[in-house]
């Protein structure tokens, strides 16, 4: 078996919050497979399913753009190297412009090739390089996604939390344009985005959207937990089923207590809005970006990075 590197142990620690020795043992037991090691730690009760890394190294901003009319929306993440630059007005303006331009782009590469919105003589890539030269830091468009209601009726809305560190884009579908324009429906879209931002473990709208392989993985983890190993099989099955149902609800938006009224669920809220709008309304999809999620900050010379992106040797 290959030797378990310190980097691999650190990655597992960041993903699970487990101790160094537990992570090393888990990786040895799973031959260095991080995802299997996470499940091994969960079966041992050492790691929880909902642990998120709190060691995010990248700076920058997550921002959104909603086209007038609410039919097109963008969620974008642009990274820089320090919080100082992230709070700079020139950087903020750049990010807002990039969010707007990403509405008509299908990839980062195509976005970079567009004429820049503030100066058509420049491409977006050239505008970014000018900002790099002015601010002295590397700047990169990490990712973006756009939602467009081309063949459906409804509304797209967004929410930005903690000054651009968390962003959510939501699409809500209705039966008619009148329904989409309903104030209650539009408020639901914004409140759903806010709910997703407040619930970091939520990954799906409803249980029926959860892939079969995710359900099976949860079943395998729960079935392998040591605290039920000695119980009769029929009791084990009931415990496992109850735990799976609870876990799957933790992953779904509609099963969460509504943040503005904990006495009802998001599903209850949607039903209330349906009744007021007089037609079917549903949250169809969402995306959440957390600034720097999954990025490891490299130890490097910042001046050399800037020069490399500027094409200077």
UniProtKB/Swiss-Prot annotation:
Principal location listed in the UniProt entry: cytoplasm
UniProt-listed Gene3D superfamilies: 1.10.286.20, DNA helicase RuvA subunit, C-terminal domain, Elongation factor Ts, dimerisation domain
Localization: Cytoplasm
GO molecular function, one term: translation elongation factor activity
GO cellular component labels: cytoplasm
HAMAP family linked to this entry: EF_Ts (MF_00050)
Stated role: Associates with the EF-Tu.GDP complex and induces the exchange of GDP to GTP. It remains bound to the aminoacyl-tRNA.EF-Tu.GTP complex up to the GTP hydrolysis stage on the ribosome.
Protein name per the record: Elongation factor Ts
């Amino acid at each position: 078996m290959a030797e378990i590197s310190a980097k691999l142990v650190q990655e597992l620690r960041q993903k699970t919050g487990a101790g160094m020795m537990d992570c090393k043992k888990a990786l040895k037991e799973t031959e260095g497979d991080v995802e299997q090691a996470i499940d091994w730690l969960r079966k041992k009760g050492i790691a929880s399913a909902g642990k998120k890394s709190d060691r995010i190294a990248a700076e920058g901003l997550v921002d959104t753009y909603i086209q007038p009319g609410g039919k097109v929306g963008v969620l974008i993440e642009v990274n820089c190297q320090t919080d100082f630059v992230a709070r700079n007005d020139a950087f903020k303006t750049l990010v807002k412009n990039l969010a707007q331009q990403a509405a008509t782009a299908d990839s980062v590469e195509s976005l970079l090739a567009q004429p820049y919105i503030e100066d058509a003589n420049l491409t977006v890539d050239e505008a970014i390089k000018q900002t790099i030269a002015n601010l002295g830091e590397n700047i990169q468009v990490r990712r973006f996604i756009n939602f467009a209601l081309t063949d459906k009726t409804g509304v797209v809305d967004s929410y930005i939390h903690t000054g651009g560190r968390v962003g959510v884009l939501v699409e809500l579908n209705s039966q008619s344009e009148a329904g989409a324009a309903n104030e209650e429906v539009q408020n639901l879209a914004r409140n759903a985005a806010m709910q997703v931002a407040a619930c970091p473990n939520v990954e799906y709208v409803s249980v029926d959207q959860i892939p079969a392989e995710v359900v099976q993985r949860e079943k395998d983890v729960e079935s392998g937990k040591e605290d039920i190993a000695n119980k009769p099989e029929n009791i084990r099955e009931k415990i496992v089923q109850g735990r799976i149902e609870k876990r799957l609800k933790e992953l779904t938006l509609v099963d969460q207590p509504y943040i503005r009224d904990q006495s009802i669920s998001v599903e209850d809220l949607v039903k209330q809005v349906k009744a007021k709008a007089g037609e079917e309304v549903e949250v169809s999809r969402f995306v959440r970006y957390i600034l720097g999620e999954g990025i490891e900050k490299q130890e490097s010379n910042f001046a050399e990075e800037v020069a490399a992106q500027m094409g200077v040797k």
